[in-house]
Every structure is written in C-alpha cells, then in structure tokens.
C-alpha cells in the first residue's frame, strides 16, 4: 500500500523537475517549416510576449557501431533559459560549442559513452551525414533527448541560421489573445501551452496510478484478511488440542469449560 502511494510522490517529482525547473516557457511554438531567425522577432511582437527563445528540432538517425536510433536532435541557444538541460543535481548543463549533449538513456541504447564520436544522419533538407563527439550527458525521466548548439547545428547543415520553432515566456493575462494570435499566424503549425501539457500529463497517468493504487489497496486488504484468518485458525486448532489433552488426563467437560 505504501509502495502504491509512493507513485503519487514520484509523479509529482517528475512534474516539478520537468515542467518547473527545466521547462520554464509558457508556450512551445512549432513552425510549419524551418524559417529564418526573423520569425522569432515576429513572435516577440505578439500580445503578452515577454521573451522568445528559438530552437531547431531536426529528425536524425544516430549510428554508433552496429546500433542505430531514430531521434530528434534539438538545436538550442548557447545559454538556454526557457528550456534548460539539467543534470541529476538540477544544475544546468552547458552545451559545448562542437559536440552533442545526450541523455544517458540514449547513450546507453546506442552503447556509447562520453567522448565517443557518433554518426548523425539528418533526415530532412539536404540530408547530410555528420559526425560529432558526445561532450556531455545528463539524466532525464522522460524520453531520450539530445541537444547541440543551434549555431553549430545550422553550420553543419550548411543552411544558414534556421529555426523550426520557439519557446515563449508570456504574461498569463494575455494567454487567450496570444493563443488567438498564434492560430492566425500562417507560419505557426502548432502552439502547445505548458499548462495544457501538464494537465494532459497528469490526466494520462491518473487512470493508471488510480488503478495501481486500487489494486494495491485490494491486495493489502486481502493479505491482511488472510493473515488474520490464518492466525485465528491456528489459535483455534491449538486450543482444540489443549482441550483434547485435558480430556485425556481425565478432566470432565464441565471442568474443562
């Protein structure tokens, strides 16, 4: 029962670490296609926007030895503030100028370690094949993310300063007009508000956690009943043997009772 209730604390820890300590933006905007940095300046002029941080999400296939993984490589600014990469101690991880910052889980799946050079097959645009060392690693509870400096990624792809979206920090009083403005912006393919993501995350796990808690409560109740019943049967059996022994010794039923 205590183990089942521990899941609630674990989920809350994931929510706080992921959606408060690491992801500090209010809206994640995705463009219909990669655009120039001017698109970020256009977002900064929308209602209630306080800060804009561009990123580039590129589909890639990682290869290391005989292993490969299809993932998304995120190009981030040199010192991200709205979507921060954290280590196990919640300390921001610096993105090296020339190299990959990879989750430990992804590195494990590839069989790679810190300092290994990984082949990166880009699956969009000119589809270049790149090679980059793993310069830093970090722990994460969700997914198998990987990062590279935005300027480095754009340089390797030889496409100039391009971005595929942006993180927005906004005044909560302007969320509704901001949402309407984003829906009316042709270059925007989607806008995900962090509050909606958190609610969806909680709702997705709620049914599973409630089922697990209910199962463990039922299991604990059944186990407690079984232990109590078994103890009562043993006690009754021992009492019966004691009474039988007294009868053998010559005591009458009245004397035993």
Predicted features along the sequence, with ranges:
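Alpha-helical transmembrane segments of bacterial inner-membrane membrane proteins
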Residues: 1-257
